[in-house]
A protein has these predicted regions:
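Conserved SAM/SAH cofactor-binding pocket of Class I
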Residues: 61-139
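Single conserved hydrophobic/aromatic residue that forms the stacking wall/gate
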Residues: 142-151
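Ser/Thr-centric signal marking residues that sit
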Residues: 44-47, 80, 99, 148
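Class I SAM-dependent transferase core
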Residues: 3-70, 113-120
Length: 151
């Protein structure tokens, strides 16, 4: 088991969140794809496996503890960047109807490729938040932003 899987499994067990082998493999693949794309388009400063697991994946999953996300909820991640927190949430909660919005097309291209490779069903939108906010279908979606760290 790799450091990513070990770190994720330990956190999941401590927080009573079920993670199976398929989900752990998706996190492994996500980290690999993230690092590969990061060399081309600078998605993150965090590239060490354990840091990716803790600072990207686990931080994203803290949303599950902070919010009661109903089954089949529709979620839009505005300014999704490299897909945090939305893609880790979708890996753990496949029932979520996920939309990811970002203003940079290169990040949308990354997210489309990532979702294809991970077998994740999600919608991506290349738009600025203020423009998408004028579009009625998106007004009713839940907005979850990445938890911030206190320094």
């Amino acid at each position: 088991m790799s450091i990513i899987s070990e770190t994720m499994k330990k956190w999941a067990d401590e927080n009573e969140i079920a993670l199976d082998e398929v989900q752990l493999e998706k996190f492994e693949d996500y980290a690999k794809i993230l690092v590969e794309w990061n060399e081309k388009i600078n998605l993150t400063a965090i590239t060490e496996p354990e840091e990716i697991a803790v600072k990207h994946f686990i931080d994203s999953l803290t949303v599950l503890k902070a919010f009661n996300i109903k089954k089949n909820a529709s979620i839009i991640d505005v300014g999704t960047g490299a897909g945090f927190p939305s893609v880790p949430l979708k890996i753990v909660r496949d029932d979520i109807q996920l939309t990811m919005l970002d203003s940079l097309n290169k990040r949308i291209n990354f997210l489309n490729q990532l979702c294809d490779e991970l077998g994740i069903k999600a919608e991506t939108i290349h738009s600025r938040a203020e423009d998408a906010g004028r579009n009625k279908p998106y007004l009713s979606l839940i907005h979850i932003s990445e938890p911030t760290r206190r320094r």
